[in-house]
UniProtKB/Swiss-Prot annotation:
Region (Disordered): 93-122
Role according to the record: Located at the top of the head of the 30S subunit, it contacts several helices of the 16S rRNA. In the 70S ribosome it contacts the 23S rRNA (bridge B1a) and protein L5 of the 50S subunit (bridge B1b), connecting the 2 subunits; these bridges are implicated in subunit movement. Contacts the tRNAs in the A and P-sites.
Gene encoding the protein: rpsM
Organism: Chelativorans sp. (strain BNC1)
Gene3D superfamilies with a match to the protein in the record: 1.10.8.50, 30s ribosomal protein s13, domain 2
Keywords for this protein: Ribonucleoprotein, Ribosomal protein, RNA-binding, rRNA-binding, tRNA-binding
UniProt-recorded name of the protein: Small ribosomal subunit protein uS13
Family (UniProt): Belongs to the universal ribosomal protein uS13 family.
One of the protein's GO biological processes: translation
Molecular function per GO: rRNA binding; structural constituent of ribosome; tRNA binding
């Protein structure tokens, strides 16, 4: 198994697919990285040389923010919104949907399990 950005990527998959196991790299970014390094799309991870793995690792470290750094930045952005006290920050603080979705009936994922109301029987 090759280890890139602190993640063990599977050896039997194509490089473009295997790179997507890294948090912050999707299909488009994976293709961009492989074309930048000069690796064909049909190459599998176990066929890569050590130099190619090193080139991929350096390209990711140099040009992209992935894994722990990306998670940290996202959480810091949410914390900043909460500290500012803006509308989006308040919605995050109250664990409600942030992007304008309705909450009267849905939003159970964000609000958690339904809480029973005392005295309401049919």
């Amino acid at each position: 198994m090759a280890r890139i950005a602190g993640v063990n990527i599977p050896t039997n998959k194509r490089v473009v697919i295997a790179l997507q196991y890294i948090h912050g790299i999707g299909p488009k970014l994976a293709r961009e990285i492989t074309s930048k390094v000069g690796i064909p799309d049909d190459r599998r991870v176990h066929q890569l040389t050590d130099a190619e793995v090193l080139a991929i690792r350096e390209a990711i470290d140099r040009d992209y923010q992935v894994e722990g750094d990306l998670r940290r930045e996202v959480s810091m952005n949410i914390k900043r919104l909460m500290d500012l006290g803006c509308y989006r920050g308040l919605r995050h603080r109250r664990s409600l949907p942030v992007r304008g979705q309705r909450t009267h009936t849905n939003a159970r994922t964000r609000k958690g399990p339904a809480k029973p109301i005392a005295g309401k029987k049919k």
